[in-house]
Amino acid sequence: MKMMNETRGVDKSPPNAQYFANAGREYMEKYGAEARDFAEIARVSHAHSANNPYAQFREVYTLEQITNSPMIHAPLTKLQCSPTSDGAGAAVLVSQKFLDARPHLKDHAILIAGQQLMTDSPQLYSRSAMDLVGFDMSKRAAKAAMAEAGITPKDIKVCELHDCFSANELILLDGLGFCEPGKAHEMVRNGDITYGGKGVVVNPSGGLISKGHPLGATGLAQCAELVWQLRGWANNRLVDDVSVALQHNLGLGGAVVVTIYKRADLKKNSRVSDGEVVKKSQFEYNPAVEARGVSAADGDRVRSKVTRNEWAMGDTEQKLQARL
């Protein structure tokens, strides 16, 4: 807050909105982006979430509606800000040995091909509003993760990034290497952040802005979406012919994690029908396109048959069912 106050000043609007709005303003001043570019990012995010059954918001908004929603901190309006959400996620990690012993799982196993955690460097004190929200550390983490995975930004056709505010998505398009430096707003204007464009499809889930921001579970929500994309299960919003995906998640203060996922069979994804998902999985439905509550039977199915402990579970099951 002290650094922000010394550079851009502080007012009574929400502090996080000020941090990221200031970063957006800096990009506008340096490269010529306009307020409409941030609004267009939000429009795309809300459009994407219409096909995500887990999204907190599934309404589709026009650019005018987004621009005319209440101003939070210029240039960001309400519909360009992520909500605080409730949510949970889980991922199962297995060894290569485990997978090799189960070849029937390989066509929907996803490899963590590269992963890097970075923290703020002395660049944080550059008096840049962009670096204050993680631009520099995101750039370094992305470069290192891609090098580890043996890919370049041009190999990535789908990503989930931390769009807590639309301004952060815009600067990250630049920081993650999806465009030439200073050209992120041109990418947005050309339609290159969504289906049918020439760039990467950003946040097919709707992102934090529209899918929601369950804070501690946000990273796993991003992971789940990209796994479903790479498997081909997200058949109502699939980014076709993809074999690699990027995930970006950050927290101020500051740390960022960038992960590169690949299909374990190294093939490109293809659309999988709901019926095929049922055949290939333990689900009775396709969880990528249909959200269902968890039953007691579902819970029992995944609990250990060898080391389960009824005393440790206590009344957890009853409490969960009551909430659901």
Question: Where in the sequence are the language-model features?
Answer:
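Phosphate/pyrophosphate-binding loops at sites that engage ATP/ADP/AMP, CoA/4′-phosphopantetheine
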Residues: Y27-G32, A141-D155, A234
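Condensing-enzyme catalytic core mediating Claisen C-C bond formation in acyl metabolism
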Residues: E40, M71-R140, A144, D192-S205, ...
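Short glycine/threonine-rich loop-to-helix capping motif typified by GTGT followed
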Residues: L124-A129, D163-M187, P214-A217, L252-Y261
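Stable alpha-helical structural segments in soluble proteins, enriched in small hydrophobic residues
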Residues: A90, L99, M137, A141-A149, ...
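Short acidic capping loops at alpha-helix termini that bridge into adjacent secondary structure
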Residues: R36-D37, T152-K157, P181
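Cysteine-centered functional microenvironments
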Residues: T7-P14, A23, I41, H46, ...
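Flexible glycine-/small-residue-enriched beta->alpha junction loops
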Residues: M1-Y31
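Acyl-CoA/ACP chain-elongation machinery
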Residues: A42-Q56, D120-Y125, F165-I171, G216-L220, ...
